[in-house]
């Protein structure tokens, strides 16, 4: 298109041709040659406005916000030289940043920044690949005063242009430069609208990312037919909020008010939110949004499954614990109780033993166990032994109702001694029954040793019929309870056996 723009009163910088420009050593590694057809461009400081002459176009570039070179001194200037496809020698000046454009592939443009070692490719037809580059270079640091025209912003005005065909057909569009972007419907068209407004001119230099640079060369191939693919680009409308509405506001009176008026408030509402830019910069792609959705949905499902599984497991574990824990708890106190019982029993036995010993000691001190002087081997006879036993039994303590009698039973001749066995019978007769039905017996044994001398006393021992405890005279105190236990057990036994009276 041969649309001409009115240049401002500022001076434009001349463009160097590769045939006349001097080649200098590049500061960045591996700069690429430029094959852009017969168009030259010059880069000026961000403070200066953009000048577009008859066959010359100027683009202002600002360094990345990371390097903090958004505003350069007015003395220093950056030039971009575009050489013919035949001449492949790049022209680079010292202390200057160079950007080369290559259009070897159809509908694609490759931008290399020699200073920052970055390469970016831009599709002229589809605007999707431009978004990740904008994401990498972070447009969010642009000053709020300067109105930035993002590459995706023209989507909304282009859609509106598709609906209003008279924008391309109106004759005054040739005179007004902002009508050009409506015709080719490319992201550069929106830059033309910005150039129409004098105060908005600095908005172009604010765009640091490389993808904005190739937007200017897209102007020549902008036919009206491209409006249709732009309409198809409407699905990319979500990134449209990045475009500031202030730049679109001036053309509203030129175009029909009914169509442009609704667009402005919607864009303003989107611009008010400062976080929209950050969100678009970070996840602008549709696949990223899908991934985020998947990430959001999958953890919820997993959490639900895990929660259900955990609940089921916990239920099972709870059941097991309910079965096991009470048993363990019951066992533990049981064991503790046993330990306590054992300790109590041990303590009781110890205490009882101590008490018994003390009582015995006191009793022995007050009433010692009585004993007699037994016969010697030279004095011993069977009859004397019986009398000795009756004399010994008389020393025991028992009630007067008990009567006893001792008699000799037998003599056992062993190899080394003679055993003389005696029986003492106890009974408790009454006036009703002078002859007791049962009696308690105690068996005494006098051991006469054949090898011992005659002056040594004989060995005496005795047991009661209800126990096998072997007792010796003077060692254990006699208890009347022993006799009662024997007689009671015999009474119980006799009552259990029926007798026939003849």
Swiss-Prot record:
GO terms (molecular function) for this protein are: protein kinase A binding; protein kinase A regulatory subunit binding
What GO terms in the biological process aspect are recorded for it? Answer: spermatogenesis
Where would you find this protein in the cell?
A: Cytoplasm
Where are its TM segments located? Answer: none
> Where is the segment annotated RII-binding?
258-378
Q: What Gene Ontology terms describe where this protein resides (cellular component)?
A: axoneme; cAMP-dependent protein kinase complex; sperm fibrous sheath
- Which ranges are annotated Polar residues under compositional bias? 11-20
* Annotated Pfam families: AKAP28
For this UniProt record, give its keywords in alphabetical order, as a comma-separated list. Cytoplasm, Repeat
Ranges for the region named 8 X 4 AA repeat of P-X-X-P are 199-265
Q: Where are the sequence repeats?
A: 199-202, 205-208, 211-214, 217-220, 235-238, 241-244, 250-253, 262-265
Q: State the residue spans of region: Disordered.
A: 1-84
Q: Where is the composition biased (Basic and acidic residues)?
A: 24-84
Describe tissue expression: Testis specific.
Q: Which domain of life is it from?
A: Eukaryota
Q: How does it assemble?
A: Binds to type II regulatory subunits (RII).
Protein's job:
Binds to type II regulatory subunits of protein kinase A and anchors/targets them.
Indicate what this protein is called per its UniProt record. Answer: A-kinase anchor protein 14
> Which species expresses this protein natively?
Rattus norvegicus (Rat)
